[in-house]
Amino acid sequence: MPKWHWPIDPDAVPRILVEPPGPRALEVVRRDGEVIMQSFSRWYPLVVARGYGPVVEDVDGNLYIDYNAGIAVANVGHAHPKVVEAIKRQAELFLHYSLTDFYYEVAVKLAERLIAIAPISGRKKVFFTNSGTESIEGVLKIARGYFKGQRPYVIAFLGAFHGRTYGSMSLTASKPVHRRHFSPMVPNVIHAPFPHPVHCPFKAETPEECGEYALAFLEDWIFRRLVDPSEVALVLMEPVQGEGGYVVPPRNFVQGLRKMTYEHGILFAVDEVQTGFGRTGRWFAVEHFGVEPDLIATAKAIAAGLPLGAIIGRAEVMSLPRGAHANTFGGNPVAAAAALASLEVIEEEGLLNHAETLGEELKKLFRDEVGHRHDVRGLGLMIGIELLEGKKPAKYLEDVLLKAFKRGVAVIGAGLSTVRIAPPLVIPRDMAFKAAEIILDVLRGH
């Protein structure tokens, strides 16, 4: 069970002293608009001053239950003392010395730890990055490089989100705004249908049947009519689609997809940027499906909030020649120290089991209360409530999120109409249920 390490009473949260956004928050928002490029959307004007585990405090003194973990980053909570101490110790030694030009032990230790937990058999190697999108760019480059340019095609999925830099953006297909005005994309990327449990692109009766149709589409239409599988280097998927709406594919689809890649000699990579490091009750979400990937892309929760990512893969595949791929900051020593401490916290405090158990309880609560109207899905503490009007996405997601925020729950959305629930894994059960009841009360108003 997670421990409480922070100097506030968890029973006193949420606490709204000033109706949000308060005057100090509004002033920061005003200044932000004057100096920061507004190429992204904020869900509501939450201006964070401090974090306490699964709680954030705004600049006006309001306390919120953090139901998004900084977009699934703060798995061990905000300012976990073990992580903070590790950062301090490393910062007193040295802050930077480029790993791709020199050596330091803390990065080696982290690579060894990642190799130990990665669900890939045999020898593995790691490449460190600075973010999720950079990890995806690296996976794309590694896969094409492995085949020496002889397999130029890559298959991704409709509904996927892999990032906003050019390679990852070309693989992304969750919202048109991510790609509009930026063509041409990186060439030779093909998007295949993904088996959505509610919005199946085929006339399927069950998620499993939808999965079978999606596999058949790959074989019968893409491989027989569009591109020969011998020209495909990589199939990339999210074990749970994140920005696409917290969509969990059926097990038969993932297993069939892995079998297909084996048969055609195609590399199989999973984007675990949002799902990794305990979020779904496993170290990696792909473990739920009983398959092994060739490559895993990670970032977000790996270093408890510091910018770090990692690609973990079979040693044979992680074989680009010297000089072919490098960066300046990947594997930064302070971020690596934070990551090692974060992985220790996940293990020592039993956060994998806590995420799985609490996630099942929350899903049951949501299904019992609103499952007759909305679709509740997810793995562990990665839960989506897709708001529906009949079978169509509802149009009041933003109103639900804003009302929850004003009542002290910092929850965000995904997809077209999905409430995205991804609290820090250290959240106590009572606090998680308190936030859930607030969200349910807001939903009852619709």
Language-model features and meaning:
Residues 2-446:
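Conserved N-terminal phosphate-binding loop of PLP-dependent enzymes in the Aspartate aminotransferase
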